[in-house]
């Protein structure tokens, strides 16, 4: 193409010496019409304006100098450059014509030259100022035209020059696709021949400086033309573009003759070399042009460089300039050598041009890349115009300067031109090569050629870089060329020269550093991000890549570099010094750019969770990252040696992957993770490294890891960062992997322990469970040996290890493997964990997992024989659930990190764990735990085992049972749930056993926790329920006793761990609570399904399991809270009620401890919801009220015991238990859940599987909650109390309640959609959530649905439960219950969030299943999961600032929802009173509102922190979730593009993992939290303020909630669409998260429409009143809330208690403000933790808001809600349809 156009243009270029005439013939040659017009126009332009003639003199002097002196070269290279620049949108032709047209100043400007001539006066006048302005403006204008025109031209040229163009075409078209620059792509295509000929110019320049001069003339002429024409470009560029079109079209035909043109270019090049002396004669004008060119150079070098630098490509571009300078300096030497053999080299160069055409087009592509880069970077249009014309023209302009300098000596000029051209070419090649190196570890030269194809983004970048090269490279070209030229001519402006020298030295530094950078950048970037990232990061990557490629790209540039080293030896020392620095910088920059490139690529590709993960890694574009890659590799290798051979091999493999494809490596594993491909390979590969890193970090951080499992990961990541940037990668990847599925194992295991032990523990947990027990034992022993120190170091670390293990268990691949191995082991381990629990006395407290499994299996088999065939199944599920739960518990226990954590981790982590310090106590604990477990199991079965035994080991049982008993607690509640369900469903139990087994397998694959819950439900319930109804009473007594004992012990221990332990306890408690509430919620649904009889039985059984689950599951934390609560409940002297109250209080206290404000209510409510909501509603209805008081007492006591928790628990527990009728809602939702469960699982035993899966999901959620709370706790070791008590659960409650709305509505919809799919369920959640209006309408509708869909169900169950009134009370209680269960579920879901890595897939599935199966029964979980997601979304939205609006909108909305629900629920005053599901959904969101604003702020704080920590842990899973969260986070985390990328990356995992929904939520939370924990407190404060104010205002506007919220909702819809397209599951999750973000937003929006307009007005009124008050308070309090969240969370107990007490003390707030108290009060309870009094004010303001908001909402409800309701319903329905479609 370049050859053809060059040849054809050469013949006219010979006339271009005569300016217009040559230009006209040149068009005939290069493009007769196109160039004739340019030249004709150019002549009039020249004639019209003397300044244009001056410009022509500049450009034309470039042409004269370059053209006269280099006219032969110009002819040759004009053909080449015309071809090349014809490829450059005819810039080559115009630039060549510029050069050819000595008089026609910017013939090289192709068409712009005429315009430049026309506007030469303007250009000359405004050359300095206007060049930039017009370059900006003109480029902005012209690039569009040029983009379009050169696009066709370039396409034609590409078609004409398919070989050159196609190679370039592929990459450049992609660049355009990615970069969106038509011009760049086609220009790149067009320029590719130019660049190739530019390379040819290098060679020819050796022969005839004219060739290089021509190339420089095109480049410099184009640069000058760009400079000059940039000034007239606004007016001129369009004509220029037309001219360029003509010339490009004219050149398009020449490109067809590229082959011939190359030869002709050789011949004509020689002729032009001869003619160049004529042009050299014409070059007298070059001095002026040289100065002008210098000015232009300054402008372009500085101005363009400034633009480039603006684009954050300054260094790369400067480096490019330097690289080009280097190349130029090197090439001047070459050119000097080449000049001697100019004629010969001209022919050779023509041949080289032909050969180099592919490279040259690539280089030409780099010029367009530069312009495209400009367009991308700063002045997309302007810079593209300047970049396309400007860079080409700029290059001619600077080249003109150089050419002017070169005028003095045509040969030297040619040398300069050659050097510059070569520099440009080399730089272009280097850019290409570097970009390609960045793109991949492809050889630089291969990359140069390949860059034409793959580096499509590079064309723009390299155009930008070529602009740099021309702009800043003009100086470099002069500087580099003038370095030799100064030596030779020393005529270039000294300022430019010095500038050039500086740039040259810098560039050399970076160029010389470029080989390393090549290595780093080429590692995996080419493959992954070569195209998109380059387009995105082209400026940075390619520039540094160019520098890297300068040596590698062209032997000439290397030779020149060597020669130039001599020529510029003064610069070389600097260069060397700088090069060393620059080398590191280039490497680091390359790495950073690599990361940026990969990030950009990720963003562009939107591909990967890997992109998100990589961005998390890459955001650490840190200089040390390259070195840390090495360090990490070294560490990985060193530590891999410690690993097992498989692990070592995998570690080495991953190290190699990481080393060679450092970034692609995580991406590939991530994709594997996404694909669930070879988790073990991924685990071994990625986890070994990170395990090794983390192993050392874990060894170092053994103790800290307990509390800071996630912190530890972050710390380890920090350590790794300290260790090396790869450590950063590893750290972020550890964060990511732990969270992401890709390296959760990678990140998880490393953090877990020595790495080997951790890894092997993880491996044991994941895959090896299938493996021989001896293997597991060996691994356990090895792990114990390796991690004995670590594990003796702590319980924290084992817990973390276990949490990682759990995380990894829940990872999709792991899930699959683990379900296989674990399910396989589940039967083997049927006796295992249970046996371990019962036989813990016999089994050492710290038993290797393999030994533990073997021994436990044997013992459990014996016990199974003793117990029953079903109990073994239960225990198989129990074992699986146990291990999963324990793994999660370990996660939670790792979070707990105290005695609970030690025991919890000890039991599950025994293999890894067996540390002498822990072993003996744990043996005792396990003995006790075994007794307790046996007792608990027997209590479950017999309900008559010694509760004292449970009580006796309770301290240890906290620890041991934290794991064992938590698992059993999970099992027990699940078993009790199953028993409760199975009692009535006695026949179902067998079916449930099989269905639960199937479900267990299904859930095993989906979530392993579900396995044990299913089995547990299957087996235990029969005995328990059948024979355990009296036993349940005994169990209640014993539960009370145990709870008392546990409460006492837990009080002691929680007081001891009070700060760490209680937190840790909170997490186990929250785990157990989450488990129990979820189990109870699901069991509630099941029990509701089962019957009121089961309610009584389930209540007792559930209370017992719940209590046990709590006591056992909560072990220390649960026992702590339970103990206070149980003790206080017992102190309340209501044993049965106390049991329930204890259970509720325990749950409440526990969840209060966990969530501490709303969690107590949540805990209590889950007891109500799950205990009451299901069967216990009958028992708990009376205790509900009593327990309300009890719970008030208990919570008051728990205020003392739990501290802040008590207040919220009291207020919330009282309302929750007041509104005891959650059962109807639970019934409705349960049957919906059943239906959903049936629909989703298509399970025959919907009730069974609702029980099984719901309970399983609950167990999942339990374990996940444990892990999540563990993560939350970790995340907020300090904030955990703060955020745990207030923040987490506040946010969680908010999320839950929002999710409850979502779940209620979404579950109504979900009922239909859960029938469709979990994804659709999530989508229904997402769909339902998208509009809280629709939520409310859907809640109403779905109340109607739920009462209509479940009308058969809901009415049946509402009829069961006293339809509406009961539903209202149930709604109240479900408000409370849903608040609590949702809070609990949110906790659980928060746990799911926190634990999502372990339970992510499971938990996601759990959330899905909970939402589907337990959609109604586990509605709390679904709501909780979705609330949690909403919380994450709310966190993100809060971060985005929309959460607060949904919070206030939600709060008010929910009260309005309650009022709306009042329509259904007939309780306008009570948000909880509305129809149980609706009331739950809406009342819960009311709680969510206050909580959302306050607690969510706190929770965002806490969950931010939690998310931050879990983000580290869940980076991979977060990556899995990130795509979901990308959509959501795109809405919410648009400020958090990194998170978006993470979310994008996580989309794969999201696709693979519904757990991403929770993860997504968590990570949206966490990602948002992570970014926004720092940001959020600022950003969330601001955004909360803005979001609340704006969101409230938006909500006021009602449609503006749709604006902001609907922006999110359309984004949610779009994102949900994209995510629907991307992932059905991910879409479900995205729909969930996005819909929940949308839901929150739509809650803002929909609530803005129905309730949001009601409550937007209301929330905007109150929220703006509160925006002034709660909004202001919310904003300040969100600020203060986030800040106070941590502060007050730190001081959490007292402020919380005060606030809680106040809120609890507010009866009004507790009733209508019950939702308010639950919302505001619970939030105040939570929020008090966070905000303390502020929260109260907020709550009061919110309550006022809620009340006002109800009024306003009612008004707005009537006014805006319907419009917006419809709008947002439409939005939601569109989102739903999108989600449904997806």
Swiss-Prot record:
A lipid is attached at residue 2 (N-myristoyl glycine). There is a cross-link at residue 1051 (Glycyl lysine isopeptide (Lys-Gly) (interchain with G-Cter in SUMO1)). Anchoring protein that mediates the subcellular compartmentation of protein kinase A (PKA) and protein kinase C (PKC). This is A-kinase anchor protein 12. Antibodies against the C-terminal of gravin can be produced by patients with myasthenia gravis (MG). Expressed in endothelial cells, cultured fibroblasts and osteosarcoma, but not in platelets, leukocytes, monocytic cell lines or peripherical blood cells. The keyword Phosphoprotein applies. Residues 157-168, 739-749, 1164-1174, 1253-1267, 1603-1612 have a biased composition (Polar residues). Residues 266-557 are annotated as: Involved in PKC-binding. A motif (AKAP CaM-binding 3) lies at residues 801-821. Residues 528-537 have a biased composition (Basic residues). Transmembrane segments: none annotated. One of its GO terms (cellular component) is Schaffer collateral - CA1 synapse. It is found in: Cytoplasm, Cell cortex; Cytoplasm, Cytoskeleton; Membrane. The modification Phosphothreonine is found at residue 642. It comes from Homo sapiens.
């Amino acid at each position: 193409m370049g050859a053809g156009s060059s040849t054809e243009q050469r013949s006219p270029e010979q006339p271009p010496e005569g300016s217009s005439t040559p230009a006209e013939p040149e068009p005939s040659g290069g493009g007769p019409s196109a160039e004739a017009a340019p030249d004709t126009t150019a002549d009039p332009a020249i004639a019209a304006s003397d300044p244009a003639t001056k410009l022509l003199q500049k450009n034309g002097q470039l042409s004269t100098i370059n053209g006269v002196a280099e006219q032969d070269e110009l002819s040759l290279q004009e053909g080449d450059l015309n071809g090349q620049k014809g490829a450059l949108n005819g810039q080559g032709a115009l630039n060549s014509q510029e050069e050819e047209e000595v008089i026609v100043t910017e013939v090289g400007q192709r068409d712009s030259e005429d315009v430049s001539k026309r506007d030469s006066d303007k250009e000359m006048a405004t050359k300095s100022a206007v060049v930039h302005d017009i370059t900006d403006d003109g480029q902005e204008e012209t690039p569009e035209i040029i983009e379009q025109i050169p696009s066709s031209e370039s396409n034609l040229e590409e078609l004409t020059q398919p070989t050159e163009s196609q190679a370039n075409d592929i990459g450049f078209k992609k660049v355009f696709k990615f970069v969106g620059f038509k011009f760049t792509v086609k220009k790149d295509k067009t320029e590719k021949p130019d660049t190739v000929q530019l390379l040819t110019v290098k060679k020819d320049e050796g022969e005839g400086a004219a060739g290089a001069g021509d190339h420089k003339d095109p480049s410099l002429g184009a640069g000058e033309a760009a400079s000059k024409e940039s000034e007239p470009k606004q007016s001129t560029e369009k004509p220029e573009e037309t001219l360029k079109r003509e010339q490009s079209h004219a050149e398009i035909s020449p490109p067809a003759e590229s082959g011939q043109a190359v030869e002709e270019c050789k011949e004509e090049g020689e002729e032009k070399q001869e003619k160049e002396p004529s042009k050299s004669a014409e070059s007298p004008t070059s001095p002026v042009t040289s100065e002008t060119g210098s000015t232009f150079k300054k402008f372009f070098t500085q101005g363009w460089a400034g633009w480039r630098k603006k684009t954050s490509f300054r260094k790369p571009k400067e480096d490019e300039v330097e690289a080009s300078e280097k190349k130029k300096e090197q090439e001047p030497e070459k050119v000097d050598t080449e000049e001697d053999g100019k004629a010969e080299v001209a022919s050779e160069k023509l041949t080289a041009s032909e050969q180099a055409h592919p490279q040259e087009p690539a280089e030409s592509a780099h010029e367009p890349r530069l312009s495209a880069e400009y367009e991308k970077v700063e002045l997309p249009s302007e810079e593209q115009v300047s970049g396309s014309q400007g860079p080409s023209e700029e290059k001619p302009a600077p080249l003109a300067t150089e050419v002017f300098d070169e005028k003095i000596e045509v040969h030297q000029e040619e040398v300069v031109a050659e050097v510059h051209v070569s520099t440009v070419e080399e730089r272009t090649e280097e850019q290409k090569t570097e970009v390609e190196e960045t793109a991949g570890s492809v050889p630089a030269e291969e990359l140069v050629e390949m860059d034409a194809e793959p580096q499509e983004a590079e064309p723009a970048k390299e155009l930008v870089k070529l602009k740099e090269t021309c702009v800043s490279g003009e100086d470099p070209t002069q500087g580099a060329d003038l370095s030799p030229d100064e030596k030779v001519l020393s005529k270039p402006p000294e300022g430019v020269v010095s500038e050039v020298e500086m740039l040259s030295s810098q560039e050399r530094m970076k160029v010389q550093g470029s080989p390393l950078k090549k290595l780093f950048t080429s590692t995996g970037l080419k493959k992954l991000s070569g195209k998109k990232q380059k387009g995105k990061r082209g400026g940075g990557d390619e520039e540094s890549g160019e520098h890297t490629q300068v040596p590698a790209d062209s032997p000439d540039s290397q030779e020149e570099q060597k020669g130039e080293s001599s020529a510029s030896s003064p610069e070389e020392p600097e260069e060397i010094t700088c090069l060393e620095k620059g080398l590191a910088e280039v490497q680091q920059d390359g790495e950073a750019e690599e990361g940026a490139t990969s990030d950009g690529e990720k963003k562009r590709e939107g591909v990967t969770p890997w992109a998100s993960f990589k961005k998390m890694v890459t955001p650490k574009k840190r200089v040390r990252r390259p070195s840390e890659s090495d360090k990490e590799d070294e560490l990985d290798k060193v530590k891999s040696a410690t690993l097992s051979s498989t692990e070592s091999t995998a570690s080495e493999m991953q190290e190699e992957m990481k080393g060679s494809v450092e970034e692609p490596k995580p991406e590939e594993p991530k994709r594997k993770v996404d694909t669930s491909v070879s988790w073990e390979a991924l685990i071994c590969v990625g986890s070994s490294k990170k395990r090794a890193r983390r192993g050392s970090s874990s060894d170092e951080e053994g103790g800290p890891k307990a509390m800071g499992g996630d912190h530890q990961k972050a710390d380890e990541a920090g350590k790794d960062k300290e260790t090396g940037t790869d450590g950063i990668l590893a750290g972020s990847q550890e964060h990511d992997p732990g969270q992401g599925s890709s390296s959760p194992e990678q990140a998880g295991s490393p953090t877990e322990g020595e790495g080997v032990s951790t890894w092997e523990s993880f491996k044991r947990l994941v895959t090896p469970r299938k493996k021989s027990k001896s293997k597991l034992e060996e691994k356990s022993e090895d792990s114990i040996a390796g991690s004995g120190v670590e594990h003796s170091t702590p319980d924290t670390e084992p817990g973390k290890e276990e949490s990682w293990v759990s995380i990894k268990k829940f990872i999709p691949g792991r899930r699959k493997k683990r379900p296989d191995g674990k399910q396989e082991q589940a039967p083997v381990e049927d006796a295992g964990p249970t046996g371990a629990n019962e036989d813990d006395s016999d089994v050492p407290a710290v038993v290797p997992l393999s030994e533990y499994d073997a021994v436990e299996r044997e013992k459990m088999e014996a016990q199974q024989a003793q117990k029953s065939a079903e109990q073994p199944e239960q225990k198989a599920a129990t074992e699986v659930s146990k291990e999963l739960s324990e793994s999660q518990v370990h996660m939670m226990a790792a979070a707990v990190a105290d005695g609970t954590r030690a025991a919890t981790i000890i039991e599950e982590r025994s293999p890894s764990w067996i540390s002498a310090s822990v072993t003996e106590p744990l043996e005792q604990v396990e003995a006790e735990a075994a007794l307790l477990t046996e007792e608990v199991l027997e209590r479950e079965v017999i309900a008559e085992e010694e509760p004292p035994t449970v009580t006796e080991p309770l301290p240890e049982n906290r620890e041991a049972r934290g794991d064992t008993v938590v698992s059993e607690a999970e099992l027990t509640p699940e078993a009790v749930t199953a028993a409760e369900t199975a009692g009535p469903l006695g026949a179902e139990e067998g079916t449930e056993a099989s269905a639960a087994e199937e479900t267990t397998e299904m859930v095993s694959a989906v979530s392993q926790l579900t396995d044990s819950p299913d089995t547990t439900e299957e087996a235990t319930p029969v005995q328990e329920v059948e024979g355990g109804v009296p036993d349940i009473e005994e169990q209640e007594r014993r539960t009370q006793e145990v709870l008392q004992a546990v409460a006492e012990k837990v009080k002691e221990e929680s007081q001891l761990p009070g700060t760490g332990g209680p937190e840790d306890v909170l997490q186990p408690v929250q785990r157990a609570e989450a488990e129990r509430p979820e189990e109870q919620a699901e069991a509630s649904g099941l029990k509701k399904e089962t019957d009121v009889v089961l309610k009584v039985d389930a209540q007792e059984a559930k209370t017992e399991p719940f209590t046990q689950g709590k006591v056992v599951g909560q072990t220390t934390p649960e026992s702590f809270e339970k103990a206070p609560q149980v003790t206080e409940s017992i102190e309340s002297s209501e044993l049965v009620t106390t049991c329930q109250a204890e259970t509720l209080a325990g749950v409440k206290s526990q969840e209060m401890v966990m969530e501490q404000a709303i969690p107590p209510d949540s805990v209590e409510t889950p007891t109500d919801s799950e205990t009451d909501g299901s069967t216990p509603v009958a028992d708990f209805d009376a205790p509900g009220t009593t327990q309300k008081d009890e719970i008030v007492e208990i919570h008051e006591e728990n205020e003392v015991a739990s501290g802040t928790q008590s207040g919220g628990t009291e207020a919330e527990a009282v309302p929750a238990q007041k509104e005891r009728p959650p059962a109807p809602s639970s019934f409705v939702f349960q049957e919906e859940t059943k239906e959903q469960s049936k629909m989703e699982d298509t399970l025959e035993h919907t009730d069974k599987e609702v029980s099984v899966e719901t309970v399983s999901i609950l167990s999942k959620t339990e374990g996940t909650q444990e892990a999540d709370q563990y993560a939350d706790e970790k995340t907020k070791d300090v904030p955990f109390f703060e955020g745990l008590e207030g923040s987490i659960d506040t946010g969680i409650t908010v999320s839950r309640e929002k999710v409850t709305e979502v779940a209620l509505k979404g579950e109504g919809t979900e009922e239909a959609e859960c029938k469709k799919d979990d994804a659709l369920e999530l989508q229904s959640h997402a769909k339902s959530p998208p509009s809280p209006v629709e939520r409310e309408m859907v809640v109403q509708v779905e109340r109607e649905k739920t009462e209509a869909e479940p009308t058969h169900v809901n009415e049946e169950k509402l009829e069961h439960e006293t339809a509406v009134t009961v539903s209202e009370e149930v709604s109240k209680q479900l408000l409370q219950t849903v608040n609590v269960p949702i809070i609990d579920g949110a906790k659980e879901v928060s746990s799911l969030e926190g634990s999502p890595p372990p339970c992510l897939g499971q938990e996601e599935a759990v959330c899905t299943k909970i939402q589907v199966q337990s959609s109604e029964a586990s509605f709390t979980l679904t709501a909780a999961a979705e609330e949690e997601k909403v919380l994450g979304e709310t966190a993100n939205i809060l971060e985005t600032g929309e959460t607060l609006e949904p919070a206030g909108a939600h709060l008010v909305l929910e009260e309005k929802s309650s009022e709306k629900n009042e329509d259904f629920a007939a309780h306008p005053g009570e948000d909880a009173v509305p129809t149980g599901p609706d009331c739950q959904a809406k009342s819960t969101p009311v709680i969510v509102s206050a909580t959302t604003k306050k607690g969510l702020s706190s929770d965002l704080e806490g969950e931010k922190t939690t998310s931050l920590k879990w983000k580290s842990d869940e980076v991979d899973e977060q990556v899995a979730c990130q795509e979901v969260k990308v959509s959501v986070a795109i809405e919410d985390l648009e400020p958090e593009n990194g998170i978006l990328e993470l979310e994008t990356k996580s989309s794969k995992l999201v696709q693979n993992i519904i757990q991403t929904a929770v993860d997504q939520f968590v990570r949206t939370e966490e990602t948002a939290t992570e970014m926004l924990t720092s940001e959020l407190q600022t950003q969330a404060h601001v955004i909360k303020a803005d979001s609340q104010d704006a969101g409230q205002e938006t909500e006021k506007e009602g449609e503006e909630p749709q604006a902001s919220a609907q922006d999110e909702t359309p984004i949610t819809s779009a994102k949900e669409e994209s995510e629907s397209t991307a992932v059905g599951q991910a879409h479900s999750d995205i729909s969930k998260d996005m819909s929940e973000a949308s839901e929150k937003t739509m809650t803002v929006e929909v609530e803005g429409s129905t309730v949001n307009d009601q409550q937007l007005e209301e929330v905007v009124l109150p929220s703006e009143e509160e925006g002034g008050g709660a909004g202001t308070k919310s904003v300040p309090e969100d600020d203060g809330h986030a800040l106070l969240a941590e502060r007050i969370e730190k001081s959490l107990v007292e402020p919380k208690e005060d606030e809680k007490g106040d809120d609890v003390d507010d009866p009004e707030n507790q009733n209508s403000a019950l939702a308010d108290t639950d919302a505001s009060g619970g939030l105040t309870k939570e929020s008090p933790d966070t905000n303390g009094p502020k929260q109260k004010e907020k709550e009061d303001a919110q309550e006022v808001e809620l009340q006002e908001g109800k009024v306003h909402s009612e008004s707005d409800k009537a006014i805006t809600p319907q419009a917006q309701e419809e709008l947002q319903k439409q939005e939601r329905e569109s989102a739903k349809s999108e989600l449904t479609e997806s």
